[in-house]
């Protein structure tokens, strides 16, 4: 069903509806280590994504502001109520061993049931490839999960864990605005790749947002 839905749509990003879900928010800050706070980092990245997507004609919906932290079920309701084309959840991780590091992307799937989101898996792979091609974050691969956010959203949904704040190198990267710009560009190019036909595709890590504009991908 998802494959058919995406194959008949225009490759243009204009008028697509993309929901961005930055984790935590408000008084609930999430992970915090090495001077970096999860809720602040992911919201800043969400805003960078939002600005770039709006410039490409996308309708963007954020599930929270800087000052609130909706329940997960409310975030899911937001995504479903706006008839989203895609949902992107942003998170960072932490672990007791500071050597843990890297980026991982999750999509809906249950290996025990043989069920997977076809578009979600493809999108997760595209995001993972683009981020790892443009940054030096360790590639922790893509994984199928049956978390509520992935399972209950109608649109293809991915969650990106963008590094470990408990790891000094990852935290230092994420604290840098230029690095967050790299992440934003990688995600946006991955979004466009999802709608490109195979003959229009380009080598991973080579497309830039300006290339998308020149190609007329905003109607």
Set out the residue ranges of the language-model regions.
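Catalytic-site microenvironment of enzymes
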Residues: 1-219
